[in-house]
């Protein structure tokens, strides 16, 4: 993917644009992008609870969050999601599957909030008329995706509030088609997932997750918007809402470490919709990616040392997909 992004791009132009970017605004960009991780931790603390419904201490959740996103940057196939659940289950009295289920809940909220913010950008007068991605109207893609994730949320709400029929159905299917040990593992995982969905049963916690999701993605969009100004891009600020949405869905599937190439391609496609020259768009993408990559990666490596965990251990856990 990175090869496609760099095809026919003049590397000297890319370097020149990066060299002339406003350093102070880049610094603000990095600070804002890094602030999203404490916000993620606060939100996760609302979602993930112990067996009695009590909150966990924030420090272990912070370490699990930084390690997880560091793993996404250094390991392939979105290993950070599994690594984050693995670290949480090793530091707190919570099952791996419950932690992983809570992260799945996060992802649904992320998708719905990003789509809502994308809708703001698409509805703005500055949005390029008849913009398409892959030959399809961007508004059509966003609407279809919103329906899909809305359906996911509806199913999750049903399971959270009436878990017994779901668990009975899973048990029947697992016992019929799987060996005993494999079926037991599936049932154990199902119990953990249901526990991870418990936040959906509490209106107060649900509202809190929505609030912190909005804070998270507005802060993230602000980082993109400040970086627009650092590079002198003549694009409206609401383009940042569209950009983060396209990047977010672009990196949703397992890919290369740090989503290298996917991130740049999504940025290039989005900025081209607003008439940004290719070399400038690529320079923006590479600079943003590199500068925001470093802080969370270093924080994650520091958390590894604090929790006495080796990177190889995370890689093994990610490949196993369970603990």
Regions from the language model: what does each represent?
Residues 1-48, 320-322:
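Anchoring transmembrane alpha helix of integral membrane proteins
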Residues 1-16, 68-178, 260-323:
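Transmembrane helix-loop-helix hairpins in multi-pass inner-membrane proteins
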Residues 14-22, 54-58, 92, 195-203, ...:
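Helix-boundary and loop/linker segments of multi-pass membrane transporters
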Residues 28-32, 208-215, 246:
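Alpha-helical transmembrane segments of MFS and MFS-like solute carriers/permeases
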Residues 32, 68-77, 228-229, 244-264:
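Transmembrane alpha-helix interface/packing and boundary motifs in multi-pass membrane proteins
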Residues 41-65, 227-243:
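Membrane-embedded helical hairpins/re-entrant loop segments and their flanking transmembrane helices
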Residues 60-66, 70, 169-193:
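Juxtamembrane inter-helical linkers in multi-pass membrane proteins
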Residues 184-231, 235-237:
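Alpha-helical transmembrane segments and their immediate interhelical loop/hinge regions
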């Amino acid at each position: 993917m990175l090869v496609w992004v760099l095809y026919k791009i003049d590397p000297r132009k890319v370097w020149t644009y990066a060299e002339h970017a406003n350093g102070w605004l880049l610094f603000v960009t990095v600070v804002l992008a890094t602030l999203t991780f404490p916000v993620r931790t606060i939100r996760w603390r609302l979602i993930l609870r112990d067996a009695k419904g009590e909150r966990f201490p924030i420090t272990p959740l912070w370490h699990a969050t930084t390690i997880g996103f560091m793993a996404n940057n250094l390991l392939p196939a979105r290993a950070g999601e599994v690594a984050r659940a693995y670290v949480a289950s090793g530091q707190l009295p919570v099952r791996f599957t419950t932690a992983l289920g809570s992260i799945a809940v996060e992802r649904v909220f992320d998708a719905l909030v990003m789509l809502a913010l994308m809708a703001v950008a698409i509805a703005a007068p500055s949005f390029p008329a008849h913009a398409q991605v892959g030959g399809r109207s961007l508004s059509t893609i966003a609407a279809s995706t919103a329906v899909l994730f809305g359906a996911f949320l509806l199913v999750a709400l049903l399971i959270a509030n009436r878990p017994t029929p779901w668990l009975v159905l899973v048990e029947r299917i697992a016992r019929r088609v799987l060996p005993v040990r494999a079926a037991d593992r599936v049932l154990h995982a199902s119990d953990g997932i249901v526990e991870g969905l418990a936040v959906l049963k509490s209106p107060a916690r649900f509202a809190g997750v929505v609030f912190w999701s909005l804070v998270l993605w507005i802060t993230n969009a602000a980082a993109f918007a400040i970086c627009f100004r650092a590079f002198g891009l003549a694009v409206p600020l609401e383009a940042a809402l569209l950009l983060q949405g396209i990047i977010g869905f672009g990196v949703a599937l397992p890919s290369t470490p740090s989503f290298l190439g996917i991130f740049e391609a999504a940025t290039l496609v989005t900025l081209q919709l607003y008439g940004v020259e290719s070399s400038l768009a690529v320079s923006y993408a590479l600079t943003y990616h590199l500068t925001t990559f470093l802080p969370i990666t270093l924080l994650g490596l520091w958390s590894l040392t604090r929790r006495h965990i080796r990177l190889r251990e995370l890689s093994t856990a990610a490949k196993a997909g369970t603990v």
